[in-house]
């Protein structure tokens, strides 16, 4: 029990005994040691989205990590040049070649500011369309999953959308069996508005949220 004191019995040495209370140095404070809470969560990661120049997209699509890192503003790990992400990089490379201005919007690097490491990719599918809609996408390197990076990336994308005056609506398309992504998106007010067929991913459910909702919810949180 915190604050309790442990009192030692007086030594009984022939010819030497302490009557009454023992000397002060014989009383020791007892402090309780609280075990670490296994359920305690680490603080959320702090990330930013780092945009990539067009040639980096092409190098990653070709699986050339060395060439990509020679041009990238941040260091990229091997998974970025893996076959799993090659299709995304190829699509973005072609998109930026046709519309160089889209490079400021499309897929970038999820960069952990504290760890100084690239943990995934995130961005918009392109600039806002005439109605003010942007569609977001994000994916985390398997080595860094289940650490809060998907949430951090989603919040970074929503925060930028809220700041951009031409953006009115944020969209995300999720496969019906991707419950983890649905659960995360639903926490930020995304509501189902339809469905679509993607040639690569198959059936997807379309969810949208007002771009200003995230900024409003942040400003209403207590300090």
Residue ranges and their predicted role:
Residues 116, 148, 178:
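Conserved G/P- and acidic residue-centered "switch" motifs that form tight phosphate/ATP-binding loops
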Residues 138-140, 146-160, 183-187:
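Conserved acetyl-CoA-binding loop-helix of GNAT-fold acetyltransferases
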Residues 156, 173-174, 197:
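Proline- and acidic/polar-enriched loop/turn elements at helix boundaries
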Residues 164-173:
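Conserved GNAT acetyl-CoA-binding A-motif
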Residues 111, 137-146, 174-175:
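A short, internal acetyl-CoA/4′-phosphopantetheine-binding micro-motif in the GNAT/acyltransferase core
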Residues 172-182:
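Conserved beta-strand-loop-alpha-helix junction that forms the acyl-donor binding cleft
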Residues 8-12, 16-135, 160, 164, ...:
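GNAT-family acyltransferases
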Residues 2-8:
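Extreme N-terminal basic, low-complexity initiation segments
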């Amino acid at each position: 029990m915190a604050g309790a004191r442990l009192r030692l019995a007086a030594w009984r040495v022939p010819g030497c005994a302490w009557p009454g209370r023992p000397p002060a140095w014989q009383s020791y404070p007892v402090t309780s040691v609280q075990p670490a809470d296994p359920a305690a969560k680490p603080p959320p990661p702090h990330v930013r989205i780092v945009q990539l120049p067009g040639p980096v997209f092409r190098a990653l699509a070709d699986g050339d990590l060395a060439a990509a890192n020679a041009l990238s503003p941040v260091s990229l790990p091997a998974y970025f040049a893996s076959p799993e992400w090659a299709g995304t990089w190829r699509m973005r490379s072609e998109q930026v070649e046709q519309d160089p201005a889209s490079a400021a919007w499309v897929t970038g690097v999820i960069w952990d500011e504290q760890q100084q490491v690239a943990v995934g990719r995130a961005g918009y599918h392109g600039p806002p369309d005439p109605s003010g809609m942007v569609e977001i996408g994000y994916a985390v390197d398997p080595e860094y999953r289940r650490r809060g990076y998907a949430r951090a990336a989603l919040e970074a994308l929503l925060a930028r959308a809220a700041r951009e005056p031409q953006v009115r609506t944020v969209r995300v398309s999720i496969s019906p069996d991707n419950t983890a992504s649905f659960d995360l998106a639903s926490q930020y007010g995304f509501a189902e508005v339809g469905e679509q067929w993607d040639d690569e991913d198959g059936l997807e459910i379309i969810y949208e949220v007002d771009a200003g909702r995230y900024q409003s919810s942040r400003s209403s949180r207590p300090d």
